[in-house]
Amino acid sequence: MGHSDSSKTFRILMAGNPNCGKSTLFNQLTGLRQKTGNYHGVTVEKAEGIFHHLDHSVKILDLPGAFSLGGSSEDKQITSRVLIGHEAGDRILFVMDASLAERSLQFLLQILELNVPVLVAVTMKDVLEKKRVQLRLDLLSNEFGILFQYVNPKNGEGIKELKDRIVSPKAFCLPIRSFPWDSERENFLNDLLNSLSTEHSNSLKFVLTNSLKELSGEILQKGLPGLSLFSETPSKLIREKFERFGKRFTYLEELTQKSIYIKKILSTAIVGDPIPNERVLSKADKILLHPFWGLVSFLGIMALVFQALFTWSEMPMDWIESCVRNVGTFVGDFLEEGPLRSLIQEGIIGGVGAVLVFIPQISLLFLFIGILEETGYIARASFVMDRFMGKFGLSGKSFIPLLSSAACAVPAIMGTRTIENKSDRLTTILVSPLITCSARYPVYVLVIGAIFPSKNILGIFNVQALTMFGLFLLGMIASMFAALVFKKTFFKSDSSYFLMELPAYNTPSIKSLALTVFKKLKAFLSTAGQIILFISILLWFLANYPRIDSSLYPNLTDAELKKIQIRESYAGHSGKFMEPVLKPIGFDWKMGIGIITSFAAREIMVSTLSIIYGVGGEESTDDLKEALLKDTDENGKPVWGLSNSVSLLLFFAFACQCMSTLAVVKKETNSIFWPLFLFTYMTILAYSTSFIVFQVWQLFS
């Protein structure tokens, strides 16, 4: 075995197939010592981390999952570009799925041609054990001349041993052999390699093989280096020798030879008495993958998720409300009555605290989506949804970004990079914001909690939870029909296909889930939190100035004076100015102010209402709900009724009230036109839907 140098500071490139446990292993190795960004010149997320062990400092780069080098999507091109263009001293940690050994070895054989020190971490040992088989890593090590080690990223088994091995000078090895062609082609390749030993020595065999494929009439996958990489003299030499050789190097020949080679290795490396396939396949798949029952199962699972969001979050929400209320009281005891106290209590504590209350529900949402991903269910849902989505011009490949929008549309839109078909990708980007996201939940919970009764149906589902589930379904249906319209008008193209291999069922890693929830919640608070704080302070000023002369209203209570103050403030006059446009959809001037501020971020609607209704840090969300229900217009009629509350929910379901979403659409499409188009069509859709529903409701009520 050829070993790497013993430097105490080096970089590891983590590579592997999708769903092999690579990112979970990355989390186990780096913990919270990681950061995300984008690769230079593209929008693919870059995940980096560091771990320190035995006086070594190891930098790890988690590359996007791929099945081979090359590909048409941005993430696959990045993986290829980083691996092929590796820096001196880099090492590759290849993560291999033991349950899909043949597929993993196909990719590994390509990587071995890059002439980089490699260590292989083998996952899914537990899946093999359930099948009553073993994968002999010693035989694989002897065959390739590199080290293979079992590790379980989900429970941490083998992590310490892997860290020990990573910092060992003998861990990362140069392979003693790579994929062998038949004897004639292999001899020809070796002869050429000896002639070109000074050219591109890092990955010479890989580049040379690609060059011979080009000369054989093959079109290289996007991002792969070929004949153009060589200068004129060696390029001419390769052409001349290839023409004299007379045999072609084709993808079909390579795939055939690789399959024979890998099957021969695994025939001895896989030992045991395997259970028949019928017993290995989960009985659940008979239901979850069924064309009809699979769709019903998906809807049922999502209904249970929304039910849990309401029932499980009640206690932590009450606790956070109590904390916010106590902080408001504490601050109020130290400050004298006046503008500063009002700013801190009503503007900062009241505004920001009104949104913080909903963190338990948002955290639960991130947790449930993480569980569905790690168990392998999301892949099965994609398979089931492929046929359904095909009727609307999309493939199952668009399903994962769409479902990811239930957490946040920003990473979901970034996730469309895996969609090779450009029209499918752009369509998915434009319809993803229609899916109910976590930023809408504070508004939904507030309005639904105030207007809809909290009673059970069938003894299981809460009416409020079912209402929120209905809004989620509405977003899914709207996105499908919007996709159909776009595919029939703007993005006419051939239908794309969806090819996937279902991952095995897995037990979620508690540590990985905790890290996922933590990172997403941190991102939510760091981005939305800053906007909420700024808007809350600005809105407090607009709602409290210019100050009214209270001596003009000697017989009014403080609550009545506060109403007049807001009505006569800058915010009040702005709301009154917009009221003629908003009245046809059932909104008064207070709702109008909330609508305008929420275009910065949807959750600001709650902060806005909290400030406008004067619910400060000493009150709770229940007080805000009560304030909404008690609010009346000039005629003494309730401002918040069922008709305009439904109208408001529909407006939030369809409007694009998120600056971050518009920014990421511009970044992903590299055009200002598409975010403007997205904002325009969603705003028109939101207003027209609310208008129709409210006016029809008024007509028949």
Swiss-Prot record:
Topology of the protein relative to the lipid bilayer: Multi-pass membrane protein
Compartments reported by the entry: Cell inner membrane
InterPro entries: Fe2_transport_prot-B (IPR003373), Fe2_transport_prot_B_C (IPR011640), FeoB_GTPase (IPR050860), G_FEOB_dom (IPR030389), Gate_dom (IPR011642), GTP-bd (IPR006073), P-loop_NTPase (IPR027417)
Any one GO molecular function term: GTP binding
Gene3D superfamilies per UniProt: P-loop containing nucleotide triphosphate hydrolases
Domain FeoB-type G: 9-172
Residues reported to bind GTP: 16-23, 41-46, 62-65
This protein's UniProt keywords: Cell inner membrane, Cell membrane, GTP-binding, Ion transport, Iron, Iron transport, Membrane, Nucleotide-binding, Transmembrane, Transmembrane helix, Transport
Primary site of residence: membrane
Transmembrane segments: 292-312, 352-372, 394-414, 429-451, 466-486, 523-543, 645-665, 672-692
Domain of life of the source: Bacteria
GO CC aspect terms: plasma membrane
Family indicated by similarity: Belongs to the TRAFAC class TrmE-Era-EngA-EngB-Septin-like GTPase superfamily. FeoB GTPase (TC 9.A.8) family.
Function of the molecule: Probable transporter of a GTP-driven Fe(2+) uptake system.
Protein name: Fe(2+) transporter FeoB
Annotated organism of origin: Leptospira interrogans serogroup Icterohaemorrhagiae serovar copenhageni (strain Fiocruz L1-130)
Lineage: Bacteria, Pseudomonadati, Spirochaetota, Spirochaetia, Leptospirales
